[in-house]
Amino acid sequence: MSDPHVVARLRAAGCVWAEDEAALLVAAAVSPDELESLVVRRVAGEPLETVLGWVEFLGRRLLVAPGVFVPRRRTELLARRALEHTRAVPAGHGRPVVVEMCCGVAPVAASLEGAHAEVHASDVSATALGCARSNAPSAALHLGDLYDALPTGLVGRVDVLAANAPYVPSDRVADMPPEARDHEPLVALDGGADGVDLHRRLAADAARWLAPGGVLLIETSPGQAGLTTGAMEAAGLATWVGTDDEVGGCVAVGVRPDGVSR
């Protein structure tokens, strides 16, 4: 049950789904003082998810905290594809090795809990990795920049490498909703001049880390998918693009053929 006074304050602040948000805030608060604190934070523009402390993703609640990138529903496509490719690894191959790069709070790694895979996740944010530890307790976490964060023992062993690297062009960041622009780290949003700087870096070294037949999955946008797959093809990967209109997801896929040198 939502509080009409909370609804009115949220609506005045521009919250489109004021009644739904009010009900969530009321349910989360254990006292009137805490409810007031939560409402003040939301009215000030903080994302609802970090106010509540969780985001729903593929049917589970993931821990989020102020200052982290909040997983979007469109990233469910990336997580589903990662799980599908993990399950497709031949049984005689041994445990599949999966890496979530630029993991943030590790939505992909969290989706692989129980998949009987060796899962690694890396990010440049210690705060995000703190959340990732709760969301993906079975994963090995690594702090650092892209491949520099990974143990060298993974070279040539990765069956699935998934990344939701930032892909907003630098000159479009200012146009993003204030919940993202003002409350999420710029490093998790800004993808460089054309939005795919990190995609190029991920693709350039992927063949060295992927096992023969391993796949690189990068979330992108329909308008940038050609740039992302182009970077993969330049690195010797065979590519295609998958989309899901229901969640608004777009994933570029690159496969390492057996003959690509590491």
Which residues does each PLM region occupy?
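Non-catalytic nucleic-acid substrate-recognition regions in nucleic-acid-modifying enzymes
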Residues: 1-16
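Conserved AdoMet
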Residues: 19-85
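Residue-level signal for inorganic ion chemistry
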Residues: 25, 45, 75, 108, ...
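Nucleotide donor/acceptor-binding cores
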Residues: 60, 94-97, 214
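Conserved SAM/SAH cofactor-binding pocket of Class I
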Residues: 74-175, 223
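Mobile active-site "lid"/loop adjacent to the S-adenosyl-L-methionine
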Residues: 139, 167-197
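Conserved Class I SAM-dependent methyltransferase catalytic core
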Residues: 193-254
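Flexible, glycine-/basic-rich loop-and-beta segments that form/coincide
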Residues: 257-262
